[in-house]
Amino acid sequence: MDNILNPEDNVSQTNTETDVTDGPFQYVKEEHSSHKFTASGQNLDSPPKNKKSPLKRKAGEPESPSKRPRLEEGHGSLVVTHYNELPETGLETRSQSRIFHLRNFNNWMKSALIGEFVEKVRQRTRNIAVLDLGCGKGGDLLKWRKGGISKLVCTDIADVSVKQCEERYKDLKRKSRNERVFEAEFLTADSTKELLSEKYNDPEIKFDICSCQFVYHYSFETYEQADMMLRNACERLCPGGFFIGTTPDGFELVKRLEASDTNSFGNDVYTVKFEKKGKYPLFGCKYDFSLEEVVNVPEFLVYFPVLVEMAKKYQMKLIYKKTFREFFEEKVKNDEQKMLLKRMKALEPYPAAPNFKLVSGRTEDYEHAQKLVENGQVKLPLGTLSKSEWEATSIYLLFAFEKQA
């Protein structure tokens, strides 16, 4: 599977190393979007009169959680319930899933992102400390082990997930035998409402990396929650430390919504449903997201320029923001990352091997691949995702902030 296809690129852009084809989904960059995100009905550049904009808080204002107004429970309990009730599934079960390759592809994206910044930190220190903010069941433990870090703090709002993460870590240590494994600490906490620095075993701990994968958007229910999560992510970073993560692209979500005839969009893999169109408040812009059998919870739109502005409060500077498509095209040129893509089974072989079926039964899901096969210019099998999976994964972006001295 030497040839890799992205349905969003042009058929004519084929070469002997990586083949990409044009797919039915037309990607539109954020600058093409004219849809307005608003604050109480106002454009971002024009905050409502006689109301204090949350982005203009003075640096000296009290930040202690005890001095903040009490927040309602919000949607956090729904998120906790959902993730606590997700069953543990083995590899055999996962491999039969409609989104087996999609999940592996997203996992590969995280691996490439984490690996990139672990190497950046390693240039200045070998004792790397990491905060995994929204660790879930510990899906990134092997990535941190591969990165050779020294210390990991895992935290999540779902207590069952944290316990499963800790069990995975213990199992990892048992199987490692004489091989050194990083120290780990596990915390159950709502990082949108609780100050993590009051909970660490070492009250003076500093981190080189904070990783927040597919989680930060839950905090955009209110300004206070988004700010608290950002504080937890950034306040204990060393100068030169990084806050990295993945999150849905607000511009892409709004673009697809506005192109839809209803308040929802998606396909047989994922669906997104908003309450209404037209106005998208900076905080509390809720939508319901479902992804096959994995996710079915309320989420909140993230207007990325607001996140960039808020991060300045914690001396954080955005060093890059890339769509999944942009990041994929960059990393797949690297032979090591390309091999990892294959090992992780992040792309589906096309055509399917004898006695095997493609994950999608719809022929239109593979039109992009079939066109290239018919051209006879590539070595088979090709590596790709179905059209439906490409559409699902292309709603995301990756980001990286650096702590300024």
Swiss-Prot record:
EC number: 2.1.1.56
Keywords assigned by UniProt, alphabetized: Methyltransferase, mRNA capping, mRNA processing, Nucleus, RNA-binding, S-adenosyl-L-methionine, Transferase
Entry binding sites for mRNA: 106-107
Entry's transmembrane regions: none
Domain mRNA cap 0 methyltransferase: 97-404
A Gene Ontology BP annotation from the UniProt entry: 7-methylguanosine mRNA capping
The protein's role, per its UniProt record: Catalytic subunit of the mRNA-capping methyltransferase RNMT:RAMAC complex that methylates the N7 position of the added guanosine to the 5'-cap structure of mRNAs. Binds RNA containing 5'-terminal GpppC.
Family designation: Belongs to the class I-like SAM-binding methyltransferase superfamily. mRNA cap 0 methyltransferase family.
Protein name: mRNA cap guanine-N(7) methyltransferase
Organism: Xenopus tropicalis
Gene name linked to the record: rnmt
